[in-house]
Amino acid sequence: MHIDDAVFLEDLCPKLKLRYWRKSIHTFTGKRCIYCGKPSESIDHLLPQSKGGLSTTENCVPACLTCNGNKSDENVFYWYRKQKFYDPSLYLLIYALHHEHT
C-alpha cells in the first residue's frame, strides 16, 4: 500500500478534521483568549463572517466567550483599542496575523 492509496480518518469524518483544526487554533495561544488572556472557549473571526470573513486559520483566533460576544461583528482593531486590557504589542501581533494573508 502506498501513502497515496491511504484513507485518512479525517477524510472519512469531517467533524474530526474540524476538531483537530479548532484544537490547533487554541494551542496557538496556550488555550488563552488572544485578546484578554482568559481561557479560550470559542473561535473568533478577525474579519467577521457577516463581512465576508472566512473560517480559515489566518482569519481565526482563540477567544473567550465574553470577548467574542462583545466584539460581535465590529472591526477587531477598533474594538480592541477600546478595551481596558488593550496591549499595544498584542495589537501588533493581531494586526500581523490578520494582514499576513490579506
Please name every model-derived segment.
Residues E58-N59, G69-T102:
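A detector for short metal-coordination/catalytic motifs
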